[in-house]
Swiss-Prot record:
Protein name: tRNA uridine(34) hydroxylase
Residues the record marks as active site: 186 (cysteine persulfide intermediate)
Domain Rhodanese, first and last residues per copy: 132-226
A Pfam family per the record: UPF0176_N
Organism from which the protein derives: Burkholderia orbicola (strain MC0-3)
Reactions catalysed: uridine(34) in tRNA + AH2 + O2 = 5-hydroxyuridine(34) in tRNA + A + H2O
Name of the top EC class for this enzyme: oxidoreductase
Gene that this polypeptide is encoded by: trhO
Length: 284
């Protein structure tokens, strides 16, 4: 059976999340969906999967049900397919932020961050500069272990371990960004949008987010100016520029990404250990 995987987020002011939670949970269970939906005062973030019929019904529900007062009417979804269900259960969770930066919540009514679409970005990277002639800096806002699976060519990578470290890292390295066009990017768009807003707030000019993140870029233009795959937070571990699962796996013990080459190591025991585990043990 083909399973449809949906990902979406939207920054919008929400104040009825506690009332919505049981109703959204019930509807998802009725449809046989699995995954996670996060609701916070600053918006919604979701990763769900199910049959085509179920996911189509969910999209209609979240966009048009009177319960939501039109707040999700323009919610855009990124879609991929898999042969099996990547999630074990259905969760609707209430959070302070839909992506944790430990900064005051975004004020959606003030407008979203400036963005650049995939085709325009590719044209900039082909030329080596943006439409105004400024050099383009690609800024990876993901965690270090995600970056190691794949990233844009010559991207800035500050080796953060969690997104809440981003503001401090940017404060310490803003000289790298001054006088350039900065394009922040992440898997699906949520971290790079929040990152772009933060950079604008602290006075860094010419900042954009990559619309839809890496996955939308793959969908629109493939893997141009990108090397490797894109880490995803489900059983597939990583997707290639054709949005197909790769042979990378996640170590059950330490959650490290194990490449096909690393799977040949004697230290790799499926479900038990990997070379990263062995390295950590030897360093202890």
């Amino acid at each position: 059976m083909t399973i449809v995987n949906l990902a979406a987020y939207h920054f919008v002011s929400l104040d009825a999340n506690e009332q919505w939670r049981p109703l959204v949970t019930a509807r998802c269970n009725e449809l046989g969906l699995r995954g996670t939906i996060l609701l916070a005062p600053e918006g919604i973030n979701l990763f769900i999967a199910g049959t085509r019929e179920a996911t189509d019904a969910f999209i209609a529900y979240i966009r048009h049900d009177p319960l939501f007062e039109g707040k999700f009417a323009t919610l855009q979804f990124k879609e991929s397919l898999s042969d099996s269900q990547p999630f074990r259960r259905m969760l609707v969770r209430l959070k302070r932020e839909i992506i944790t930066m430990k900064k005051p919540a975004i004020k959606p009514e003030l407008g979203r961050a400036p963005f650049v679409d995939a085709r325009t970005l590719k044209a900039w990277l082909d030329r080596g500069h943006d439409d105004a002639g400024r050099p383009v800096v690609m800024l990876d806002t993901r965690n270090a272990f995600e970056v190691d699976v794949g990233t844009f060519d010559n991207a800035l990578d500050y080796r953060i371990d969690k997104f809440s470290e981003f503001p401090e890292v940017i404060d310490a390295n803003r000289a790298d960004l001054e006088g350039k066009t900065v394009v922040s990017f992440c898997t699906g768009g949520i971290r790079c949008e929040k990152a772009a807003i933060h950079m604008k707030e602290i006075g860094i000019d010419n900042v954009y987010q990559l619309e839809g993140g890496i996955l939308k870029y793959f969908e629109e233009v493939g893997g141009a100016h990108y090397h490797g795959d894109c880490f995803v937070f489900d059983y597939r571990t990583a997707l290639n520029p054709q949005l197909q699962p790769t042979e990378n796996v996640t170590c059950f013990a330490c959650r490290a990404v194990v490449t096909p080459e690393a799977q040949q190591s004697p230290s790799y025991v499926p479900g038990k250990s990997c070379p990263a585990c062995a390295q950590a043990a030897s360093a202890a």
